[in-house]
């Protein structure tokens, strides 16, 4: 199973944005 660079980049971007959203949610509490 080969993962293209574009797919890996999109996965990292989605994961990063999820982490940022989680951190901002915790800070707002």
Swiss-Prot record:
Pfam families attached to this UniProt entry: Hol_Tox
GO cellular component: plasma membrane
Keywords: Cell membrane, Membrane, Toxin-antitoxin system, Transmembrane, Transmembrane helix
Induction: Accumulates by 2 hours post-innoculation and into stationary phase in rich media.
Presence of the UniProt keyword Transmembrane in the record: yes
TM helices/strands, residue ranges: 6-26
Note: Encoded in the skin prophage.
Protein name: Probable small toxic protein BsrH
Originating gene: bsrH
């Amino acid at each position: 199973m080969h993962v293209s660079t574009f797919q890996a980049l999109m996965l990292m971007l989605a994961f990063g944005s999820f982490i940022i959203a989680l951190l901002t949610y915790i800070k707002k509490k």
